């Protein structure tokens, strides 16, 4: 991997879905200290908004493993479900055999397990209110919605971060 961009200093994720369940998309970006931005996203035919939120975060965590990053990096998201699940609920779910407090099977267990596997020390999730003018949140929302609707969108992408639609 090239180090030409320096450390990752910021990241953002979002998910979108039409119908819930229905066609969905996710969008993400990472910012490097040299000012460059890497954007990526994906599409699923039959999914939910929550699955797309989790997928976006998972894809960012996978990318973060390959780069130097700010030791206090925060992944910004407008999904309280993602934040609460990743930061708090997952500990109890694992202790209870992936059951909720009411005894039901945890939804999206496959993605929660993958997120836990790719968890990185000192990387936390940070809430940003959706559609509040935050530029990174607005951009990843645009990416997620475009992918969910199969609308072409130009992504900022360097050669070492691959994007396929």
Swiss-Prot record:
Catalysed conversion reaction: Endonucleolytic cleavage to 5'-phosphomonoester
Subcellular localization, as worded in the UniProt entry: Cytoplasm
Keyword Nucleotide-binding: no
Boundaries of every RNase H type-1 domain copy: 5-149
Any one GO CC term of the record: cytoplasm
Primary location class: cytoplasm
Gene3D superfamilies on file: Ribonuclease H-like superfamily/Ribonuclease H (3.30.420.10)
Subunit architecture: Monomer.
HAMAP family: RNase_H (MF_00042)
General function of this protein: Endonuclease that specifically degrades the RNA of RNA-DNA hybrids.
Protein name: Ribonuclease H
The organism of origin for this protein: Prochlorococcus marinus (strain SARG / CCMP1375 / SS120)
Gene name of this polypeptide: rnhA
């Amino acid at each position: 991997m090239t180090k030409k961009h320096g450390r990752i200093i910021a990241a953002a994720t979002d998910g979108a879905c039409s119908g819930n369940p229905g066609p969905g998309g996710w969008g993400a970006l990472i910012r490097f200290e040299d000012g460059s931005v890497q954007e990526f996203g994906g599409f699923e035919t039959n999914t939910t908004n929550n699955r797309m939120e989790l997928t976006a975060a998972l894809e960012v965590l996978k990318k973060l493993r390959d780069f130097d990053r700010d030791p206090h990096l925060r992944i910004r998201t407008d999904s309280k479900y993602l934040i609460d699940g990743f930061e708090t609920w997952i500990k109890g779910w694992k202790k209870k055999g992936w059951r909720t407090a009411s005894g039901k099977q945890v939804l999206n267990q496959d993605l929660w397990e993958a997120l836990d596997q790719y968890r990185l020390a000192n990387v936390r999730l940070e809430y940003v209110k959706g559609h509040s003018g935050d530029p990174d949140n607005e951009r990843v929302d645009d990416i997620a919605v475009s992918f969910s609707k199969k609308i072409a969108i130009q992504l900022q992408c360097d050669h070492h971060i691959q994007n396929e639609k």
